[in-house]
Swiss-Prot record:
Similarity field: Belongs to the non-flavoprotein flavin reductase family. RutF subfamily.
Protein name, UniProt field: FMN reductase (NADH) RutF
Taxonomic placement: Bacteria, Pseudomonadati, Pseudomonadota, Gammaproteobacteria, Enterobacterales
E.C. number: 1.5.1.42
Function description: Catalyzes the reduction of FMN to FMNH2 which is used to reduce pyrimidine by RutA via the Rut pathway.
PANTHER family: FLAVIN REDUCTASE, FMN REDUCTASE (NADH) RUTF
A Pfam family: Flavin_Reduct
Catalyzed chemical reaction(s): FMNH2 + NAD(+) = FMN + NADH + 2 H(+)
Matching SUPFAM superfamilies: FMN-binding split barrel
Length: 164
């Protein structure tokens, strides 16, 4: 059976909503960050996320040298920061655009993130053009912002937390 073509797959994936995240790291190879929507929960025992990173991305060499990262899930209103980390902007300029703390792993944690998952990279698997990073969560920081930022239909959208 033949595989679907690349264009059809990308068009179909535009119908799947995803949280917008900035993935950060810091260590001997330097500080780096990129925007990602290909992030999801794997299991809660142990708490594990997966992060997909294109091996042709400018940040790949840095992430390939490090064993920790922080998944910073963006809140509504942080579209410009997402765009900045998704482009060709220099790392110093990316990080200068927001306030950061040092997380439990030493990685940059976005102060105004909806939630931040400080992680240790446990396993790497290469599939096609990407590396899949399996990350054990060692610390979680939540922000009271009630609105999340989603990527759907090739654009940003706000998702409201329901009132309890």
């Amino acid at each position: 059976m033949e595989l679907a073509d690349k264009a059809s797959f990308r068009d179909a994936m535009a119908h799947v909503g995803a949280a917008v995240n900035i993935i950060t790291t810091d260590g001997p190879a330097g500080r780096a960050g990129f925007t990602a929507s290909a992030v999801c929960s794997v299991t809660d025992t142990p708490p594990t996320l997966l992060v997909c990173l294109n091996r042709s991305a400018s940040v790949w060499p840095v992430f390939s040298e490090h064993h920790t990262l922080c998944v910073n899930t963006l809140a509504a209103g942080q579209e410009a920061l997402s765009t900045l980390f998704g482009g060709k902007t220099a790392m110093d300029e990316r990080f200068a655009a927001a306030d950061w703390q040092t997380g439990a792993t030493g990685c940059p944690r976005l102060e105004a993130a909806l939630v931040s998952f400080d992680c240790r990279i446990d396993q790497r698997v290469s599939v096609g053009t990407h590396d899949i990073l399996f990350c054990h969560v060692v610390a979680i920081t939540r922000h009271p912002e009630p609105r999340g930022l989603m990527w759907f239909g090739r654009g940003y959208h706000t998702l409201m937390r329901p009132a309890c």
